[in-house]
Regions:
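RNA-binding accessory domains that recognize and position tRNA/RNA substrates
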Residues: 1-126, 140-167
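Phosphate/diphosphate-binding glycine-rich loops and adjacent basic-rich segments that engage nucleotide
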Residues: 130
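Short glycine/serine/threonine-rich phosphate/pyrophosphate-binding segments
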Residues: 134-139
Length: 169
């Protein structure tokens, strides 16, 4: 797959708030987690200087470390491994997220989606396209709320112009 095209297309789907490409780590042991996280940071950011912050979440509360410990210990590991890196908790260039569930997911990129409700979850509607800007904007806004839209345009000369028809097409 073309990674950028997938992100671009998903970024237009209503109901998606954020898209986060992740690295999946099946073995949740601390040694494996630090290795996978370090390799991920090296592959994305290399040896160039950067500031970072680590945020972690544990859905699996059986994990032996608490979220704050994971963040602090991983930050310490990354500082040792990347001498050009520094911590900035207020305005980091890189926000490294670690989510521990049955598996661990590591990511630093979060692409915003349009949000709203998934299309088709709130019924259907007809949209009358007039040739002006207000009708497609209204259609966009109602589609964002999960309504499936079918658009209709009535061409009724001499009351509607050929220009209005071309705008709709």
């Amino acid at each position: 797959y073309d990674y950028d095209e997938v992100l671009e297309r998903l970024g237009r789907v209503f109901g998606i708030v954020d898209i986060c490409p992740v690295v999946e780590c099946e073995d949740n042991s601390w040694d494996n987690l630090t290795k996978v996280t370090g390799d991920y940071v090296a592959s994305v950011y290399g040896e160039k200087p950067f500031t970072f912050k680590v945020e972690s979440r544990r859905a699996d509360k059986r994990y032996p470390k608490k979220s704050m410990e994971i963040s602090a210990d991983m930050g310490e590991y990354l500082l040792d491994r990347f001498p050009n890196a520094s911590v900035d908790v207020h305005h980091p260039q890189v926000l490294l997220n670690i989510e521990i569930r049955e598996k661990t997911y590591i990511y630093s990129l979060s692409v915003p989606g349009p949000g709203g409700m998934p299309v088709g979850t709130n019924g259907k509607a007809m949209l009358l396209l007039s040739g002006g800007i207000d009708s497609p904007v209204a259609g966009y806004m109602i589609a964002k709320r999960g309504v499936r839209i079918d658009a209709v345009y009535f061409h009724a000369p001499p009351y509607t112009s050929e220009r209005a028809k071309q705008k709709v097409i």
